[in-house]
Amino acid sequence: MVDIVMATFNGGKYLRVQLDSILNQTYKNIRIIIRDDGSIDDTVEIIREYREKYPEKIVLISDNVQCGSSKSNFMQAMKSATAEYVMCSDQDDYWLPDKIQHSIDRMLEIEQKIGKDKPVLVFGTYQPVDENLKGIKVQKKNRQESAYKLVFTNLLVQNYVNGCLMLMNRSLADAMGDYNDAILMHDWWAVLIASGAGTVEHIDEVMMLYRQHCNNVVGAVNVKSFRYRLKKILDSDTKNANILYFNQAKLLYERNRDLLMPEHQIELERFIKLYDKKKIGRMIDLIRGGYLKSDFVRIVGQLYYI
């Protein structure tokens, strides 16, 4: 079985379309676990409508916990996911019919090679669309998900995987643990664990339509444009990003170091110790260790604010 975890908040406008796309998957052995974080629109009403229609497929979590963020909402919802495999779903996308089946097929191939006890994460590709599900032309090289540098040292400072594309096995789901403020995003946290202790694999296939609208948390942006690059360097978040990466890395070490492969334990320890050095030493060790982002402009900002 596959548990599909959906974290909702004021998503009524697109929710029915997304739920229908999941229920119409070719892979049928699923359960949709939905946790709402205090919506004031018709989101909960829609969920209850679908739960009544598909009682064996839809679970609505009612725990009276106010999370206040997408990452916390997802991780709170994941506590109820007990199936052998777990996926995450946004409330406003559209899954193509074979998304689950093709993800499961690849997962089983990997588990047959390395075993089910290792954390495994597989993820596909999305097609950006507008709010009416009409295609948006975004050159592949300009997408935020373009590079897929699935190297542990790179992943410590930049995530390349959207949660809505992921399938994780039970070993990975169990290793994620409870929410902590040091976790930057639930998908990034999952990728770090899988990369350090097991494996992460990209499936080069469009599996879903990623709806672009004003309320998206993350989008398919042109990371090569001058405007985007300049904004990233000047953005106040960039100044604070390095310490956030270190805090997340420290949490990974505290919680999961015994799971990590020996070489990744060493890489993680070296990364954490960077902050004990002066700026020039940190810059040198970032470069030597390969703890770098995906392109020149991002790296400049990273080194400038380290």
Give the residues covered by each predicted segment:
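C-terminal subregions of glycosyltransferases and related glycan-biosynthesis enzymes
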Residues: I183, W189, R211-I306
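Nucleotide-sugar donor-binding/catalytic module of glycosyltransferases
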Residues: M1-N222
